[in-house]
């Protein structure tokens, strides 16, 4: 789920307006886009890449490490299952509001496969200086800068804001992982945290969470075991109960998934929790200052 230069990307829905725009941005940024999928335009070329009738057909002609889904909710299930059948390793699903029954059917199909779903409703993956997949502004050097801080976020906009604050403070990113804001997703905060813990380029991790669900609490238990420092910002401190705030998964119901419980779990695990995104950058600067002092002694 960490994008690396040279991984090949198939864009399902490449000929649509959004698919075209973002595929061009990905290519400009260095992402290796090897083809697109549109059953009605198979055999054509679009923005310089070949169009296939399906992901399975594409996999017969070229290596497909990652697929990105620019497909409407009602059709997303078939596109994702096509990518699973093609043996694609990582399927980045940008589509929001994929029907829950469809998501459960997709997860059942994943069993026994080598595929992983990132999303639904993810903004994508970014590795500054190497490329990006999805709809994050990975091409914007004011937002993303190569470095050693891994960032995990359920929200694309909050993830962008966090990376902007980090970059302005001089803290570059080793990877950005957008896990998605829908209630049922294929890659959790814990999954992403474990991946960044294993990543040799990452020396610190920022977890951008939000109200709803219990993913941050589960990630906190793992963070307790990590040697790398973990910091967090949780959005939704003032959100009223039983009201969806932005994402379908961002809702506090029956006293579960609230801001206070998430913050308490993270702090018990030794995670430093910020009140604002800008404060995270200050925490990282404190660590860098202490390390320089220790090195000089």
Where are the regions that the model predicts?
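Catalytic-core regions of core metabolic enzymes
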Residues: 1-297
């Amino acid at each position: 789920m960490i994008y690396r230069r040279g991984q090949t990307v198939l864009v399902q829905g490449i000929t649509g307006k959004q698919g075209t725009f973002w595929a061009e941005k990905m290519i400009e940024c260095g992402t290796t886009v090897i083809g697109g999928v549109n059953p009605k335009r198979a055999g054509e070329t679009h923005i310089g890449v070949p169009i296939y009738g399906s992901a399975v057909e594409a996999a017969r002609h070229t290596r497909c490490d990652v697929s990105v889904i620019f497909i409407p909710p009602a059709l997303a299930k078939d596109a994702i299952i096509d990518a699973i059948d093609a043996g694609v390793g990582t399927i980045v699903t940008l589509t929001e509001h994929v029907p829950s029954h469809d998501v459960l059917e997709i997860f059942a199909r994943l069993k026994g496969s080598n595929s992983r779903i990132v999303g639904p409703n993810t903004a994508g993956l970014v590795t500054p200086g190497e490329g990006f997949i999805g709809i994050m502004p990975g091409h914007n050097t004011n937002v993303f800068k190569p470095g050693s801080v891994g960032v995990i976020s359920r929200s694309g906009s909050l993830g962008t804001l966090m990376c902007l604050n980090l970059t302005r403070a001089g803290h570059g990113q080793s990877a950005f992982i957008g896990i998605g804001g829908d209630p049922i997703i294929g890659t959790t905060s814990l999954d992403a945290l474990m991946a960044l813990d294993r990543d040799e380029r990452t020396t610190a991790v920022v977890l951008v969470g939000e109200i709803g669900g219990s993913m941050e609490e589960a990630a906190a238990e793992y963070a307790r075991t990590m040697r790398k420092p973990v910091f967090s910002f949780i959005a939704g401190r003032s959100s009223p109960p039983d009201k969806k705030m932005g994402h379908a998964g961002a809702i506090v119901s029956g006293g579960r998934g609230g801001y206070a419980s998430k913050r308490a779990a993270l702090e018990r695990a030794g995670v430093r929790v910020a009140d604002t995104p800008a404060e995270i950058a200050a925490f990282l600067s404190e660590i860098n200052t202490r390390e320089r002092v220790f090195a000089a002694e």
